Design a protein with these regions (language model features):
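Charged structural interfaces that engage phosphate-rich ligands
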Residues: 1-198
Length: 198
């Protein structure tokens, strides 16, 4: 997917949010504005996409604005709706389907991958998925490398993109000592939580 936020149609985002808010029985207990008022504010935020660059004003004409906190919420609502529609209408549901923002991993039979990919892309004219197939060393998802063992179990390892610099906070830098210790603890925690025991 090129950029998730700029691919989300504002009208679709507002439509999905409207249905969710109008069907939310406890909205009045959590906030004083009505569903209609929240939708009006949402529409105002999503359509206020003007910005100044080198002395000229521009307006984004499609999609939600990158960097806007409401764009993250709307992108997740739209993607959830799209995924629910796609999985409920596809003949063979994926055995595994996980998404974090715009990074998705799915497990299907190899023969079903092109069909499911097309089915996902048919859900919306603007939101398009790309496919990365399992390579001999596995497939990456977020910061994990996932491999299928001969017995069908999944083995996970820590994954770093080829652009990863391997640069961390230098111990002899003038940073607080607790920050330096947290770098080591975070790396250790990541390894123990992500990696499948050998």
């Amino acid at each position: 997917m090129a950029s998730l936020f700029t691919s989300i149609p504002v009208e679709l985002a507002v439509q999905i949010a409207t249905v969710r808010l109008e069907n939310n029985q406890s909205l009045h207990e959590r906030t004083s504005p009505s569903a209609k008022e929240v939708i009006e504010l949402l529409e105002f935020c999503l359509k206020s996409t003007e910005f100044l660059f080198r002395g000229s004003y521009y307006k984004q004409i499609h999609g939600t604005a990158m960097g806007s906190p409401v764009s993250v919420i709307e992108a997740n609502l739209v993607m959830e709706e799209l995924e629910n529609n796609a999985s409920s209408t596809f003949t063979q549901r994926p055995r595994l389907y996980c998404r974090f923002v715009d990074d998705t991993i799915a497990a299907l039979k190899k023969t079903e991958i092109p069909k499911f990919h097309k089915h996902l892309n048919d859900q919306n004219v603007y939101i398009k998925f790309t496919v990365e197939r399992d390579k001999k060393d596995g497939i990456s998802f977020l910061d994990t490398l996932n491999q299928v063992n001969d017995d069908g179990s999944i083995c996970t390892k820590a994954y770093r993109k080829p652009t990863h610099s391997e640069r961390y906070l230098q111990f002899d830098s003038h940073q607080p000592l607790q920050h330096k210790g947290m770098v080591a603890r975070a790396l250790f925690s990541r390894a123990t939580k992500i990696c499948t025991p050998a």
